[in-house]
A protein has these predicted regions:
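Sec-dependent N-terminal signal peptides
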Residues: 4-12
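N-terminal leader/targeting pre-sequences
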Residues: 17-60, 65-166
Length: 166
């Protein structure tokens, strides 16, 4: 019996050290040509997102995690609203008021290319904690900038790109 318990504990500690990496394609929405990739890597209790997008209009574009992993609608409305398991106000990540879907803004250069990396211990890939698990959610790229205070969306504009996180 003691051997079985020790093996179970060893299995749990090895699982928590495992690196998980998933890559997804950005799908164009709202009759745009938005394209790119989103890679999520979970390692040592943190998730890093690496979002590379092109064919954007130059300037700032809001990025949020939305509540449903469904990008089927032409305007990405099927992704639902911002993922907000704690029911907090919209805001800037790590400010007094923000929710788990608040990521920030991509800054597209004159050629329409942008990259955003983001790392947090507040997300996980497939864990049992619904307050952290981003599997089954989506990333939505918006036409406008997130002003970090307009409720509930940051006045970010239309949805021009969508990623289903599976």
């Amino acid at each position: 019996m003691k051997k079985l318990i020790l093996i179970g504990i060893a299995d749990l500690s090895l699982a928590s050290c495992k690196t998980i990496s998933k890559q997804y394609v950005v799908r164009p929405k709202s009759h745009t040509e938005t394209q790119g990739t989103a890679t999520f890597t979970q390692k040592k209790g943190k998730v890093e997102m690496d979002l590379s997008v092109f064919k954007l209009k130059p300037g700032l574009h809001a990025v949020h995690i939305h509540e449903f992993g469904n990008c089927s609608a032409t305007d990405a409305s099927s992704a639902g609203g911002h993922w907000n398991p704690s029911k907090d106000d919209h805001g800037k990540w790590q400010s007094d008021h923000f929710h788990m879907g608040d990521i920030g803004n991509l800054d597209a250069d004159k050629d329409g290319q942008a990259r955003l990396t983001f790392s947090t211990d507040k997300w996980c890939l497939g864990c049992d904690d619904p307050m952290k698990n981003i599997i089954g959610k989506s990333i939505v790229i918006h036409a406008g900038v997130d002003d970090f205070h307009t409720q509930p969306t940051g006045n970010a504009g239309g949805r021009i790109g969508c990623v289903e996180i599976k």
